[in-house]
Amino acid sequence: MPQEESAPRMDTPSSEEPLDKQNRKLEDQEEEMGFKELDGLREALANLRGLSEEDKSERAMLCSRIQEQSQLICILKRRSDEALERCQTLELLNTELEEKRLLEAEELKAKNQQAQKLEERFMTLASNHELMIRFKDEHKRQNAKLREENEKLRLENDQLFSPALKAQEAKVVQLTAQSEALAKELETLQRKYAHDVCQAQAREQELLELQNRQACAHTEETEQLRMQLQSLQQQQQEALQQTAKAEQAHSQQNQELRARLQTVTREKEELLLLSMERGRVLQNKQAEIRQLEEKLKMADVARRHALERFEQEAVAVNSNLRVRELQRRVDGIQAAYDELRLQSEAFKKHSLDLLSKERELNAKLRHLFP
């Protein structure tokens, strides 16, 4: 029996094999040992039947040895089960630790990326700050230089130009002020016209909404009257005795419908009167625009006369710098006048568009209420 016990111990698998395979091999070896012990017990019992007292005492010793071996086997099996449980627990702990390690690695990677982005942003901000400082210094330097040049030019202008040119400059300033006043007047008229147009559009929208509501109400009333008429016809077919009463109610409803139609007709006439009044307002605005255009033409003529006088007087002056300065101012006045003329044309075009829209609206109203 000791030889049989030593044999399975030599067949124990190495630690390099997986734990589940080792457990299965241990279980198989224990089963084989149990079968072998049972076979040995059967053989021993068969031999004991034909043995003497000495053999029986020897058999008792063998039985005690067998019990000891079985106890040892139980102890070994219990230890192997405990070792298996410890291995499984260690595997679970290892798995949890591996998952935690992966999570910590991902968090560390994310924090590293965030730190890298913050560092890149900080470097970008630092470079932008340096560029801003350089730009500010350069701007200060150029500003100081331009101020010095401006002061020099002002002193030269004070020394070079005569009172005649100053008077001419005063005339140019006066013409510029007149042009600005005309521009402000035009802007005021434009704002007033825009306000009137907005009010007219709002009134038109209100009238259209009122018309739509009245049309819907009229349609609903017509539908209700039609349904009532059908009901009256059915009642007439069912009960011939109530014919007189039904005709009287029907005539009353027709009278109410005529009265409502007359009310709608009066409202349509009021809408037409409002549209005509709006047309008169637009005509008045167009008259104001024509007056403004005449003023612009007069200002243009005055500007041309001033330019001619300025050119005649500028020929006698032997200073290219002052002539260029005055020419720049004249060009500025010309640009302002061109811009004012373009605004006037745009305002005129907008007025024509509004007039065409009003005509279309009047045509639609006439089509709806012939």
UniProtKB/Swiss-Prot annotation:
Gene: CCDC89
Organism, as annotated: Bos taurus
Keywords, ordered alphabetically: Coiled coil, Cytoplasm, Nucleus, Phosphoprotein
Source taxonomy: Eukaryota, Metazoa, Chordata, Craniata, Vertebrata
Coiled-coil intervals, chain numbering: 19-346
Localisation per UniProt entry: Cytoplasm; Nucleus
UniProt cross-references to PANTHER family, sorted A to Z: COILED-COIL DOMAIN-CONTAINING PROTEIN 89
The organism's place on the tree of life at top rank: Eukaryota
Quaternary structure and partners: Interacts with HEY1.
Record family assignment: Belongs to the CCDC89 family.
Cellular component GO terms held in the UniProt record: cytoplasm; nucleus
Keyword Phosphoprotein recorded: yes
Protein name in UniProt: Coiled-coil domain-containing protein 89
Biased composition (Basic and acidic residues): 18-38
Region of interest (Disordered), ranges: 1-38
